[in-house]
Amino acid sequence: MKRFVIGVPGLDKLVGEVVAPYTILIAGHPGAGKTTLASTICYANALKGEKCLYISLYEDKEKLFRYMERLGLKLREIESNGLFRFVKLPLTFDINMIIDEVGKLVGEGYSVIVVDSITALLEVVRENVEKRAWLLNYFYQLPVLFNGLLILVSELPFGEERIGLGSIEFVVDSIFILKHRIEDHLLTRLIEVRKTRGSPINIAEAYFTIAENIGIVVFTPPILQEIPHEGEELVPICNALKNVIGHFHKGFIINVFFPPEAPMGREAILAILST
């Protein structure tokens, strides 16, 4: 069985095992980080020796490579090793020509395929219900055809969180919704794990950032069953404190309450506990 990774530690833990055939839908507002996440998944699996194909209808290759290089994703390097290929398909093509070209590319032995974005393709056939249904069915079956990981990127209008791609939400294995908003004059990024087939969703939403030379970092809160066992016993040197609480252990969480007018309140308590 082919196994894949997301390439982001926090997400790998939430999603669990990714076994082919597998489909991930990445949806989000413009600028939310969809292309960055799709590229991260590609890059992480290419480093494991899996061939990745990135099909784009918008992105410029040089611009994408340059931006990802700043995030620590060396796409040129894996391209030179034959593990990454970027193909831009202009929307001026007829939809049948685009699918024919995708079919030819799929036959070249790729394990990971990104389509950025499926929204653009569906927009072309918006008025043709039968063609739209046929196109969606094609992408349903695609990961089975090449027995690998398919990553679909979808655009969400600002202010909306509904994907609006029809039944595709029911057949994909994982759905990530990327969001961003302004809080206290700062940009806050959130990732919602809306669906992960075969894994319980213990944490549905987490903060993340996109850092230079690092890429995507997801800040997942601890899951209750993963809280470590109590550490070694500690006995406070302060006799008064010792008489009140006895002892405590490394890893304990201690709530300290004191009146605001107490002299050296917080500093004094921290000094006592640190001994």
Predicted segments, located by residue:
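N-terminal pre-Walker A segment at the start of P-loop NTPase domains
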Residues: 1-10, 221-242
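Hydrophobic/aromatic beta-strand patches that form the interior of the parallel beta-sheet core
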Residues: 24-26, 53-55, 85-87, 151, ...
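Conserved inter-motif catalytic segment of the P-loop NTP-binding fold
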Residues: 50-129, 275
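Phosphate-binding/switch region of NTP-binding enzymes
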Residues: 149-211
